[in-house]
Amino acid sequence: MSEFAARLIRWQKTQGRHDLPWQRTRDPYRVWLSEIMLQQTQVATVTPYYLRFLERLPTLADLAAAPTEEVMSLWSGLGYYARARNLHACARAVVERHGGAFPQEPAAIAALPGIGRSTANAIADFCFEAREPILDGNVKRVLCRCFGIEGFPGAPAVEKRLWSLAADLLPDSEVGAYIQAQMDLGATLCTRTKPRCDACPLAEQCVARREGRTEELPQAKPRRALPEREAIFLVVRDGERVLLEQRPPQGIWGGLLSLPELPEGADPARHAESLGCEVLSVARLPPLVHAFTHFRLTLKPVLVEAKALPHAAEVGLRWLALSEIESAALPTPIRKVLQEL
């Protein structure tokens, strides 16, 4: 066993995290759910979503059988909604292809929708006693700093080198503890900013610490200015309820409920009338800016006071009581707009 692995395992046993809800099980459904939720989302945010999700959908079969809207509602607020759509598709694929039993081989797990190599390996390691390296964001940061790896970790050549290094460092025993130690170290000590090098078990061999480069490594992705987009959304209100539509499965907020988006160049009042509304008044609300990974969106909501739409379901729309905003499957910026009403 390498000194790197030995130090990490010793540290994990005494200083690592042992009380997270997904650490108390080897059920691949629950481990997989935690791995997907933890992608680009911190533990403190994930934990209540994880527990609530399992309370409603305690088994993979429950998830596979659930309506899409229920899954999206449970995910609402976590962001990166493609994860929820892939999660649902993956559960159905396990039922259809594997009789409802999660496959045990990493390659078979990675062939499922929304599961990449690192997530597949983590599931196999924690649930089926496999011996496979992982390479999530925390592990990349630890390896880049400890071994002085140059370049952006997401670049193909750098990522290939990191996979090779991760495989070479993998111990022959206590793989689960080692994998957990890497993730714990990156999440608690070897953080993106202000790492706690004084408490790190790898401090003596860490290149970044020795050279004073912990803020520099791993190197960031070359930044580009985010493109700017605008969209006008109709807030059609009839008393204490608002009119919503379901977004198409693909694209931003796919599958979620949202305010009707106004086609480019369309007049808000006329568009509301085309939906069957009797328009009483129209007023513009304050804009809201929301940053996505690849662009910034300025939402320009327009409040349309109207009388009830008689046949909303016939045109793909539905009414939602304002009292149900918090529990509905709404994108965060749309929920913020409605909370201001």
Q: Where are the language model's segments positioned?
A:
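Catalytic cores of DNA base-excision repair glycosylases
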Residues: 2-215, 226-228, 277-278
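Intrinsically disordered, low-complexity, charged terminal extensions of DNA damage-control enzymes
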Residues: 1-18, 23-24, 187-341
